[in-house]
Regions:
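Single, function-defining residue in the core of a domain
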Residues: 1-181
Length: 181
């Protein structure tokens, strides 16, 4: 992840990523997740976690927090400089041991609660994007199996298949909504 974020910053590319491990910070002795716990909550967000596999659906309340930090280069990557990022956290309230915790890192400036909520909204939409790619690449149109010789033909057909994938995804959502009503 560190190399990826370094590349994104060096090329002034925007990003929102979820940190899956607590990282060392340059400006604090504590790690990212401990730093996040100490931040004040600026908003409460309600979220319904859908049923999946053996997990039951549940409603949760999340504390929204944000700040600016510099990620310290890992010990085995001393040649890298620290990476300044904005942190947005969505941490489930309560005492459950399996609490939801989204630790998001972004290049987008976070100056207020509205900025933080916008980043959370981007992250919440990740499943829609992943579903689109799944339908486009393999499940629905199988664009990956195309064996065209011409780059132009491949581009044209990819665009057509992307349109078809969008329609297939819309039909799936309409079916799911219909089943709920």
């Amino acid at each position: 992840l560190f190399e990826y974020l370094t590349y994104k910053c060096q090329h002034q590319q925007r990003f929102v990523v979820r940190s899956m491990q607590s990282r060392c910070l340059e400006e604090h002795a504590q790690k990212l997740y401990d730093y996040a716990q100490a931040l004040p909550s600026v908003e409460t967000k309600a979220l319904t976690i859908p049923q999946k596999g053996g997990r039951k659906a549940r409603d949760v309340k999340l504390d929204v927090k944000y700040g600016q930090v510099t990620l310290k280069a890992p010990a085995n990557k001393k040649e890298y400089a620290g990476i300044p990022v904005y942190y947005v956290g969505c941490l489930e309230q309560g005492t459950s041991k399996d609490k939801l915790a989204w630790h998001l890192l972004t290049s987008e400036p976070i100056n207020n609660v509205e900025d933080a909520m916008r980043i959370i909204g981007y992250y919440e939409r990740r499943w829609l994007i992943e579903d689109f790619h799944k339908v486009w690449k393999s499940e629905g149109t199988d664009v990956e199996s195309l064996r065209l010789q011409s780059k132009d033909n491949l581009e044209r057909l990819s665009v057509i298949y992307a349109f078809v994938a969008t329609r297939l995804l819309a039909l799936r959502f309409m079916k799911e909504v219909d089943e709920l009503t």
